[in-house]
Regions:
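Short, composition-biased local secondary-structure segments
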Residues: 1-5, 20, 183-192
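Generic detector of well-ordered alpha-helical segments enriched in charged/polar residues
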Residues: 51, 85, 89, 138-142, ...
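ATP-dependent carboxylate activation and anion-phosphoryl transfer catalytic cores
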Residues: 117, 125-132, 191-293
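Oxyanion-binding "anion nests"
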Residues: 140-188
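A generic structural-conservation signal
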Residues: 40-41, 63, 180, 230-232
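Conserved small-residue-rich
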Residues: 22-23, 29, 287-294
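Active-site nucleotide/adenylate-binding loops and adjacent lid/helix of ATP-dependent enzymes
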Residues: 2-160, 211
Length: 294
């Protein structure tokens, strides 16, 4: 009855399913074959490929490494050729092949599926600060990082906000620098992706999901074959079916993080660890009391 797991990969997790989820091109192909909505786009290795894909789908676009994660190497809402070329070079620091997709407007949602059943859903927001009309962006970042919930890496429920190329690029597009003083109540986004690992926050929306979206996400976990599956969705909301509000699936993640569900910035915390134990040790199955190392 011994069961093993590391992070959110278990002894029941399929190696093939993990390989599929780590390959955005293969994931997208499988979802398209299953008539699941995904963003249009293509794969690039050089500027010629990039130009051809842009001619096909038009601006704005998203550029990201084919086998990347945690938003590393991604450029979002790219609207002109010079920025697209820079985004391609940036993504190629993380992967030889790059995926380019149509930029879809809406909010970033993460849906957690365990054992092919919905467990939790969260709306994610990129790292940001809110202006007070007095302090600079740098000072606001430092103040935000004093939140006791923020730590380094995954040591706490939220992550410190670091200033990197993504941050400076976003500020430059606004005509801002770290020394700019934002207007009172002005929200200044510091990252282009909503990952908690880059300082993002989350709001629980589990109880707001439309039944059709629940069915869709549970089906995705079966299509890819993951026992623990994080489905990333871009949509205006999850209260309507994606086919009605124009939403689509962005990615499917193996080893999805649990922090945003266990301790959301807003909303009801979800005990997402319990379904993992129930999957490994189903109720009623003859076994010893499970001993878990954390």
């Amino acid at each position: 009855n011994q069961m093993r797991f590391q992070a959110t990969i278990t002894c029941k997790t399929s190696n093939i399913a993990v390989d599929i989820a780590c390959n955005k091109e293969e994931t997208k192909r499988m979802l398209e074959l299953a008539s699941i909505p995904v963003a249009s786009g293509g794969i690039c290795v050089d500027e010629e490929d990039l130009e051809n894909v842009i001619k096909k789908i038009g601006y704005p676009i998203v550029i990201k490494p084919l086998d990347g994660n945690h938003g590393k190497g991604a450029s979002i809402n790219v609207k002109k050729w010079e920025d697209a070329v820079a985004g391609l070079a940036y993504a190629k620091n993380y992967s030889r092949r790059v995926i380019v997709e149509k930029f879809i407007t809406g909010y970033d949602f993460r849906v957690l599926i365990i054992d092919n059943k919905l467990v939790a859903a969260a709306k994610r927001e990129p790292a940001h600060v809110k202006g007070d009309g007095t302090h600079t962006i740098q000072q606001l970042i430092e103040e935000t990082n004093k939140d006791p919930r923020r730590g380094y890496g995954h040591e706490n429920v939220l992550t410190q906000i670091d200033v990197d190329r993504d941050t400076t690029d976003l500020l430059e597009k606004l005509g801002y620098t770290l020394e700019t003083v934002p207007r009172k109540d002005e929200v200044v986004y510091l990252k282009s992706t909503a990952n908690l690992s880059t300082g993002g926050t989350s709001v629980d929306v589990t109880d707001m999901m439309h039944p059709e979206n629940i069915f869709l996400c549970e089906r995705i976990s079966r299509v890819i074959g993951l026992d623990i599956c994080g489905v990333d969705i871009m949509a205006e909301n999850l209260t309507q079916p994606l086919k009605e509000n124009g939403g689509c699936i962005l990615e499917v993640n193996a080893a999805p993080g649990f922090r945003m569900h266990l301790a959301p910035s807003e909303g009801l915390p979800r005990n997402v660890a319990a379904p993992v134990i129930d999957m490994l040790y189903p109720p009623g199955k003859p076994s010893r009391i499970p001993i878990i190392a954390v």
